[in-house]
């Protein structure tokens, strides 16, 4: 099987790397090197030039997002699930994303939408949109699902830091789910008030904390480090 240009995770004993299989090339780490021509299947194990065993496999969404090259701060995987559920995104959705950023959330939304969905992603920075386009095509090219045919990237500023300003020149008149991802509580107060004033119901404000546990035999304990506050998720629903 030809794995040319296949996006993969190469996992050594100490680190994970995101790479693309390229015929005739080698992947070099401080634990040795491997030849991409030796990759015959996925997943598989390969012995490096120093005798170390490397695992090679297709990246999950979480692995890809955390290891990819990025510009602006990403929305972390722990928050993505809550955002998608709050927005009720499915294969028939029409989605407007304000603030493309590095494309982490854009990617996951795109993977959920169907061929008849509509998806518009706005950003004032064209570099962000170019980066996001590469991010999405690079990840989804690993698969062949019936995902959305096209994402329409629009170069426009709708004030990501002040989402309440959206309602100054726009009016919601169809059933709509709204989700904002914000770093500060002062922003949360303003957008929640604005949603209330513009007819939104079921307004929720939450933040997601993620703490892993270690389980070894009869001993169980939480890990000493955890992923705490990364942003507030504010959601609401406009019902006619």
Indicate residue ranges for each PLM-predicted region.
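Conserved class I S-adenosyl-L-methionine
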Residues: 90-101
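Conserved SAM-binding loop and adjacent beta-strand
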Residues: 67-80
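Glycine-rich helix-loop-beta junction characteristic of Rossmann-like nucleotide cofactor-binding loops
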Residues: 85-90, 112, 170-171
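C-terminal substrate-binding/active-site "lid" region of AdoMet-derived donor-dependent transferases
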Residues: 167-232
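S-adenosyl-L-methionine
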Residues: 122-164
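Short beta-strand element of Class I
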Residues: 116-120
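Conserved SAM-binding loop of SAM-dependent methyltransferases across substrates and taxa
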Residues: 102-115
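N-terminal auxiliary segments of SAM/dcSAM-dependent transferases
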Residues: 1-58
């Amino acid at each position: 099987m030809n794995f040319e240009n296949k996006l993969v995770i190469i996992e050594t004993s100490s680190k994970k790397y995101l790479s693309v299989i390229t015929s005739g090339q080698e992947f070099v780490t401080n634990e040795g090197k491997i030849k991409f021509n030796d990759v015959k299947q996925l997943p598989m194990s390969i012995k490096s030039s120093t005798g170390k065993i490397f695992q090679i496999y297709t990246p999950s969404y979480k692995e890809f997002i955390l290891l990819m090259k990025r510009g602006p701060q990403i929305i972390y995987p722990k928050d993505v699930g809550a955002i998608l559920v709050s927005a009720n995104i499915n294969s028939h959705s029409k989605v407007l994303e304000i603030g493309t950023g590095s494309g982490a959330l854009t990617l996951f939304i795109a993977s959920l939408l169907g061929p008849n969905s509509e998806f518009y992603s706005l950003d004032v920075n064209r570099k962000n949109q170019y980066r996001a386009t590469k991010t999405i095509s690079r990840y989804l090219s690993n698969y062949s699902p019936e995902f959305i045919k096209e994402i329409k990237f629009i170069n426009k500023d709708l004030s990501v830091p002040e989402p309440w300003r959206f309602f100054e020149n726009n009016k919601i008149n169809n059933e709509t789910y709204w989700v904002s991802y914000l770093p500060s509580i002062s922003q949360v107060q303003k957008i929640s008030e604005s949603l209330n004033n513009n007819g939104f119901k079921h307004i929720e404000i939450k933040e997601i904390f993620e703490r892993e546990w270690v389980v070894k035999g009869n001993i169980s304990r939480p890990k000493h480090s955890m992923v705490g506050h990364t942003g507030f998720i504010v959601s609401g629903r406009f019902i006619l």
